[in-house]
Amino acid sequence: MKPARVRIALTVLSILVAFVAFAVWFMTAMPGTRHRGPLQPLGVGDRQLLANLKAHVVAVASEEHNVGRPEALERSARYIEATLSGLGYAVSRQEFETEGVKVRNLEVRRTGPGAGKARLVVIGAHYDSAQGAVGADDNGSGVAALLELARLLKSVQPAEGLEMRLVFYVNEELPWFATEKMGSLVHANGLALGEREVVAMLSLETIGWYSDAPGSQRYPFPFNLLYPSTGDFIGFVANPRSRSLLHRVIGSFRRHAAFPSEGAVGLESITGVSWSDQWAYWNFGWPAVMVTDTAPFRYPHYHTLRDTPDKLDYDRLARVVLGLESVVRDLVIAAPSN
């Protein structure tokens, strides 16, 4: 090969190597340090949290509950409403119809001082199950976590100009995902029509199953080349536009929670990256992060009738909730930067 061609080939190779290195850094570099080592016992005061999480999952996800099973879906919705009302919240309904069934999103708010339209920090979880599934992990775990966050955060005072919204969505699962009947898309569209600004959104999606067994964790390409093979962590996933929020969220979680965590930035075309309610907010250009145990990439009972309340690890779920409580407090005390 001629010297000129060698130089060109080396230059091209150097550019490719630099591009790959940058892409890996962009996707995987996260603030803080991942917790390693044994978990400390939960405190005495945290036992109530653990018991509440179990009770919530049993109440909302002991049977298939979706538009195809409207009575069960209604029971889950009423439990959520009753629990929030019992905590002293005024529960707002966003009602619409799906195949002749009246369904609803449920929302509670805490608003900081100041005039004008507050910027929004939205924490959400869907409460419907997939067809043919009980839905304890997907997504009774997310609903239980959000109900407990409502309890833990009921006295929070958002900063001036900020409003915290806790939202329970219907119709996240197929066949409604990414359609006009998807609950979170209905919610996000309503905010856009009202000219509201979402500065941060967290989607709590399937967060209750963990394993210490080597090989228990799988990933879509290219994450399988970059992340650990043991499913003992909680994951935080964002699209490139939400990278700044992801760093803020996982940095806060790692400061406050002695629990393993991993973060990833991925294109929405990568399998699984957009598989939850954060997708609805991405559609409007708002920063949003999915919090997940990675669902089908770890959980053997995903979308089956075996996804029952007895399968979940409530001790570890409680630790995740405590970490998320601190994350949300950090988000609503000061305005998140986009």
Show where each model-derived region lies.
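N-terminal capping segment at the start of a domain
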Residues: W25-A72, D128, R298-D307
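A non-catalytic alpha/beta surface segment that caps or lines the substrate-entry region
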Residues: V44, H56-P113, E262-A264
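Active-site-adjacent substrate-binding region
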Residues: A200, Y210-N338
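Acidic/histidine-rich catalytic neighborhood of metal-dependent amide-processing enzymes
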Residues: A130-R241, V273
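Structural recognition of the beta-strand scaffold that forms the well-ordered cores
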Residues: E107, V121-G124, R165-F168, V199-E205, ...
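Solvent-exposed loop/turn segments at secondary-structure junctions
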Residues: V67, A90, E97-E99, G114, ...
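Stable alpha-helical elements in mature extracytoplasmic
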Residues: L49-V57, A72, S76, I80, ...
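Hydrophobic membrane-insertion alpha-helices, especially the h-region
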Residues: L10-T28
